[in-house]
Amino acid sequence: MNLLEHMGKAAKQASWQLAMLSTAKKNQALAVIANLLESESQTILQANERDMAAARESGMSEALLDRLLLTPARLAAIANDVRQVCRLNDPVGRVIDGSLLDSGLKLERRRVPLGVIGVIYEARPNVTIDVASLCLKTGNAVILRGGKETHYTNQATVNVIQRALEQCGLPAAAVQAIESPDRQLVNELLRLDRYVDMLIPRGGASLHKLCREQSTIPVITGGIGVCHTFVDENADFEKALLVIENAKIQRPSACNSLETLLVHQAVAKTFLPLLSARMHAFGVTLHASPLAMPYLADGKAKVVAVEAADYDDEWLSLDLNVDIVTDIDAAIDHIREHGTSHSDAILTRSLSHAEYFVRAVDSSAVYVNASTRFTDGGQFGLGAEVAVSTQKLHARGPMGLDALTTYKWIGYGDDLVRS
């Protein structure tokens, strides 16, 4: 039995124990984790500094460096997120529906843990804590495989989690991490279907492709966010600029940040110079289509010609594609061709246009007069999220607690036999 099989077997055994825990016991463990994250913050931050130094030396982009960075404020927020998970309702054991059949059998459909979840992710140290806390709350064990960029940070945070579990009399194997950077171990994890019940990759398109093609475990993909906002012909310009500013500026490296702005041709001449002035204030580079370039070339913001490939990639930086479309249908067509089914928005004062856009755009989150930055487990009231699913089965959008459960049928009888 190799390393991964040992980890898988230990995780499966831990999952059976976790599935039997009361909500109070799970919350106790989460509270201890949150407290230890704070008391051991210097150890974790020092580990993160080692990862940051190595990442800078390797030439990592500023966008990815921002994702990798832990600050005292970010770590405190992560600890508070764990406490927020404590306060969330536990879905395990909840009766979804039920009925009394003509046969006399009382039938219930009840939420239960999935079992063991595997998560593969890149330069996102917060994922370690977010995923572990959600899995523990739902009675699932988890095997984590972070990128080599987060090696020391993940090592420190998993150590804290395992210490907390042991303090609460729970198996440390409930949260395990694959520490070796050997990529072969990822391939082995993808085939660990004897022990792992669901796999969640959080990374780029190449990782998602690898998991879809090689995994023998059910995979939930998502997190790649080529997010769009369409400025309709009757949008309120000043309010629209505020929404665009939030969607692009607040955290450019986030997967729910705005990447492509589509502007109705009827308002492009007036709106685009205003956009240029607003984006200039934040150092945003505009990547303009041939149609948009004449209205942006003399503006305040830096502008370059958009490349065809730009429409299909995440910038994750202070860059924004800008194109002009003839009408709402052209905007929808653009989103269908280039979007990733993550988060897309329309800015409009027309109720009929808003409803049409919502029905036509097939993304996991669609917004009317709101920023794409809202696609987040915390913002949706779900607590921390394990991922943002852009597929339709078994979960869609920010994956909170319910998405980490399945259900079983339970029948109660009085020595019933089938006639």
Swiss-Prot record:
Keywords: Amino-acid biosynthesis, Cytoplasm, NADP, Oxidoreductase, Proline biosynthesis
Enzyme Commission number(s) of this protein: 1.2.1.41
Pfam family, one: Aldedh
Catalytic class of the enzyme: oxidoreductase
Superkingdom of the source species: Bacteria
A GO-annotated cellular component: cytoplasm
Subcellular location: Cytoplasm
Disulfide bond sites: none
GO biological process: L-proline biosynthetic process
Principal location listed in the UniProt entry: cytoplasm
GO molecular function: glutamate-5-semialdehyde dehydrogenase activity; NADP binding
Pathway: Amino-acid biosynthesis; L-proline biosynthesis; L-glutamate 5-semialdehyde from L-glutamate: step 2/2
Entries under InterPro entries matching the protein: Ald_DH/histidinol_DH, Ald_DH_C, Ald_DH_N, Aldehyde_DH_dom, G-glutamylP_reductase_CS, Glu-5-SA_DH, GPR_dom
Reactions the enzyme catalyzes: L-glutamate 5-semialdehyde + phosphate + NADP(+) = L-glutamyl 5-phosphate + NADPH + H(+)
Family: Belongs to the gamma-glutamyl phosphate reductase family.
NCBIfam families the UniProt entry points to: PRK00197.1, proA
Cited HAMAP family: ProA
Chain's role: Catalyzes the NADPH-dependent reduction of L-glutamate 5-phosphate into L-glutamate 5-semialdehyde and phosphate. The product spontaneously undergoes cyclization to form 1-pyrroline-5-carboxylate.
Name of the protein: Gamma-glutamyl phosphate reductase
Gene name per UniProt: proA
